[in-house]
Amino acid sequence: TGVLFCLLMAGSPYGLAEKPVLTDWNYLPSYGQSLSVGWTAKPVVTTEQKNGNLMFKGGVRPFEGGNDRSAVIPLVEGVSPDGARGETPVSGAAGNFMRLLKKRASGKASNVRFLCSADGVGGVSIGVLSKGNAPYQRILDDLTAGRELASKAGKSFSMPCFLWTQGETDQQDRKTGEWYKEKMRALIQDIDADAKAVTGQKNDVLCFGYQVASHLNYFARNP
């Protein structure tokens, strides 16, 4: 059982995804550039966790909390130490997933939790976020730590999907649609393969994305 989403699939990025398999703990990262980590998104609104969702001990942005993945705690949002980042997209997404699951499969919802993390980097190209670079390693570290913590807690663990909020930098750099498509396809396939290798899951990792259709180039003015 699970929830049906219209998403980008690892092997077929423009198709209709099958229902993802949900385990006890489900790793859900918010990935991309600045919006994915809550740039200027203040005040924060998720100050109390009402759906049982989780984050690592270091916070929803673990890189701000010393990358402390030694335990899980209730998912809440906070302002970054430098004051630049606030509410990330992952809390709203996880909360809505849980509310939808409670409507469609209330019996299963009582056992399901999302383990959330915001691992993006502001102002970078999709290339910087691709496999082999430091931001991507955050996802691998989350996966490994999540699997170990879930095992200790006697919980099943998988990665059903990730949130993707990126594209403004590549649009500014005049990258073509075909170039971006291939980069995106490779990223989804890499995350899918690595998640399966860590968790042992059979189901594909799905991707929620958005379209940067009307973005003005940085520092441009709207006449």
How would you label these PLM feature ranges?
Residues 1-2, 21:
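Hydrophobic alpha-helical segments and their boundary regions
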Residues 2-11:
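Bacterial N-terminal signal peptides
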Residues 16-223:
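Cell-envelope and extracellular/periplasmic
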